């Protein structure tokens, strides 16, 4: 006997395909990316249902997706809308590859424009103030000084520095090996001041009760997490009398300082672990006007 539920079943229902898409993402994407992609798909499904639009994959047309995008444009920032747009593109790309649809309803749809806004950087004076709060000789001060200098000197992401193991840091060659997005490992260089700070921290780390742990950074109860780094920086900002800084601003500042010192954009892209030049352009724009003014020479004076 066929039940009402069975008769209402639609093979290409977005609700059904969502579970299969989640399996696909779990095999190829990070957990955070998976959550973002599924949230975007769930929001689209909810919109289609609320508007009485088709919820079977083959019935969804461009105008249905555009209706959702238009609504979200009024609700979220351009960067968030762009992220959701790309997430939905990935879903329809997957559905096309799996023969669930004959063509993507997002085919030839243009991604929402994200205005290029300069990312905030930390001035050298403010970083010195931040570092001055770590001038003590105890374990916490030595650890925090090493952490701040390493992030400032290399531009590594918070998650990358949190994932460091003791064996990943080579003081002699002043190199650290970090694992970035997608599990890609790269080597980053640091300077002599950072090497000295790391050495001072490691000497005190040997006496820590969790010293046998592989994790490079240790708190009172064991390895530090990325969220703990944000708390450390926030605490140091208060001590220095500075506005709260986000750990990613150290990455922004590294990019700016590297270009300001004459570094090449292609080299910076490799050092920072960016797979797309789009991020490079955004970071490089942070102080591009300042660099342009500094490099200005008067054509009249050359007459």
Residue ranges: model-predicted function:
Residues 1-303:
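Conserved catalytic core of the tyrosine transesterase superfamily
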């Amino acid at each position: 006997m066929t039940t009402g539920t069975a008769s209402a079943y639609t093979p290409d229902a977005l609700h059904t395909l969502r579970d299969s898409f989640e399996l696909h993402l779990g095999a190829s994407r990070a957990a955070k990316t998976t959550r973002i992609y599924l949230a975007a798909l769930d929001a689209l499904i909810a919109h289609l249902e609320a508007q009485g639009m088709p919820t079977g994959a083959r019935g969804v047309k461009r105008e249905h997706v555009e209706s959702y995008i238009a609504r979200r444009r009024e609700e979220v920032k351009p960067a968030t809308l762009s992220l959701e747009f790309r997430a939905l593109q990935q879903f329809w790309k997957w559905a096309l590859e799996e023969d669930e649809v004959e063509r993507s309803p997002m085919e030839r749809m243009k991604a929402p424009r994200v205005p290029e806004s300069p990312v905030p950087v930390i001035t050298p004076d403010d970083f010195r103030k931040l570092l001055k709060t770590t001038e003590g000789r105890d374990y916490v001060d030595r650890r925090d000084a090493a952490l701040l200098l390493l992030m400032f000197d290399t531009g590594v992401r918070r998650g990358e520095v949190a994932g460091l193991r003791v064996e990943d840091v080579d003081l002699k060659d002043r190199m650290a090996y970090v694992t970035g997005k997608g599990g890609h490992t790269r080597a980053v260089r640091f300077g002599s001041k950072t090497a000295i700070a790391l050495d001072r921290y490691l000497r005190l780390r040997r006496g820590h009760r969790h010293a046998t742990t592989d994790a490079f950074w240790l708190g009172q109860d064991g390895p530090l997490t990325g969220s703990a780094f944000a708390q450390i920086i926030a605490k140091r900002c208060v001590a220095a009398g500075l506005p709260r800084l986000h750990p990613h601003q150290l990455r922004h500042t590294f990019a700016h300082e590297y270009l300001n010192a004459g570094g090449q954009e292609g080299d910076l892209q490799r050092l920072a672990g960016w797979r797309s030049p789009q991020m490079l352009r955004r970071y490089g724009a942070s102080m591009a006007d300042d660099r342009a003014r500094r490099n200005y020479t008067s054509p009249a004076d050359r007459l």
